[in-house]
Amino acid sequence: EEMLFSQPVDFKWAKYHIKERLYDGHKGTYGIIMHVTGCYHYRGAALLAAKAAVYTGSGLVTVWSNEKVIDALSLFCPEATSCQRQYFDEHLLQGKEAILIGSGLGLNDDSERFVCELLSHTPVVIDGDALTILAKHPELLENHHSSWILTPHHGEFKRFVNFNQTSELVDQANAFAKKYHVTLVLKGPHTL
């Protein structure tokens, strides 16, 4: 049975969904995630995403990015591990329970090729520039076979659907999520 609903993401929701920490827990207990984020011009997006993941309880966070982001990461979020872009290999994705892709990634041919390849076979959280790339490749939405969470703000969501009034937003979001079998977190003043 398909579940479809719109619910604000607020403190009450978060408190219900965040696991209690175990006395004998370790970084492997709380999730092993990869962030494919950041570029020379948008370092902050990668750094904020890494810090948010660590501070909300992720166990092991690895950031795949360029040298400038990695250098800043060691100061801004020393709990996160890193991998420089030029050393990336698909084996680095093995064992990851979640992947975030797109926050400040940048829009260029290399990013587009990589996003298209990664989205074709990996469960991911899709944000920022990866959403822009995905909007250019709707066939990926129609043919994906893994769990996807899309996190657009209203402007990014307009790249996928037409809506004229905010009152249409919830209906459009529900229809989109149902059609493409994705979880949609529509960011805004009242995140759904």
Language-model regions, residue ranges each:
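Small-residue (G/A/S/T)-rich helix-start motifs and N-terminal tracts that mark the onset
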Residues: E1-P123, T132-I149, H154, K158-L192
